[in-house]
Amino acid sequence: MVPYQELTLQRSFSYNSRKINPVTSPARSSHVRSPSSSALIPSIPEHELFLVPCRRCSYVPLSSSSSASHNIGKFHLKFSLLLRSFINIINIPACKMLSLPSPPSSSSSVSNQLISLVTGGSSSLGRRVTGTLYGHKRGHVTFSVQYNQRSDPVLLLDLAMSTATLVKEMSSGLVRIALECEKRHRSGTKLFQEPKWTMYCNGRKCGYAVSRGGACTDTDWRVLNTVSRVTVGAGVIPTPKTIDDVSGVGSGTELGELLYMRGKFERVVGSRDSEAFYMMNPDKNGGPELSIFLLRI
């Protein structure tokens, strides 16, 4: 049996302390330039080696971009000013078919001016007017239009139906009165100045109505003064029993009671040849509805 022996191995450390010269190294010896070729290439100092500009990089000064944006801003400003002036030059027509002017103040002089204007044309009335239907029980109905409940009437229409017939029609809850007149060529007559109208009530021809403009009789003044404090309502006004009682003579034709109905009407202007008055129900409880149309055809 072989006896156990310890073996010791020693490592040897050796290094080469020779420095490698890149000029004399074998890898660079094959790439060393000849003196003739190196003489043709100028030498570049080390401090200027990284300061050579690239041909592909173009330097754009900041002043040129700011001047371009300034020019664009001036162009937008001039264009906006030109557009605004162009819009101001254009006159866009507005629809004045349904436009109603504001009513004037309720003084006596202005009220007289209102009467003269409305008898010549209905454009000075407001959108809300006061309408009164009145007449003797056995006589014809008169329709009065006022700016307010205390002003002078601007339109008086003697309708072609009796008061009793109107009361009977209104008991059905729906009354449509249409007044038509012929349009005359080259006529400057206003709608309220038309003297004669053909009257229709709920589609049935009733006869002819007469317009008196704003001319009031003594009976008209008495009725309107009596109901001047009434805004909405209906009733009976005490009157003489006969026509002759008014003049002082003892006998005559019996007129009957004078009935009236008063309320606010909404006035709608369709054109210079058409207007409408709609009776407004204040409590909206489905009461009698009345509409009066003025048409020039």
From Swiss-Prot:
Its main location: endoplasmic reticulum. It is found in: Endoplasmic reticulum membrane. Disruption phenotype: No visible phenotype under normal growth conditions, but mutant plants are impaired in hydrotropic response. NCBIfam families: A_thal_3588 (TIGR01570). The Japanese words 'mizu' and 'kussei' means water and tropism, respectively. Plants over-expressing MIZ1 in roots have a reduced number of lateral roots formed, however this defect is recovered with the application of auxin. One of its GO terms (biological process) is chloroplast organization. Keywords: Endoplasmic reticulum, Membrane. It holds the Pfam family DUF617. Disulfide bonds: none annotated. The keyword Endoplasmic reticulum applies. This is Protein MIZU-KUSSEI 1. Expressed in root meristematic region, cortical cells, lateral root cap cells, columella cells of the root cap, mature region of the roots and leaf hydathodes. It comes from Arabidopsis thaliana. Plays a role in lateral root development by maintaining auxin levels. This function requires GNOM (GN/MIZ2) activity. Negatively regulates cytokinin sensitivity on root development. Positively regulates hydrotropism in roots. Induction: By light and abscisic acid (ABA) in roots. It comes from the Eukaryota. GO terms for cellular component: cortical endoplasmic reticulum; cytoplasm; endoplasmic reticulum; endoplasmic reticulum membrane; membrane. InterPro entries: MIZ1-like_pln.
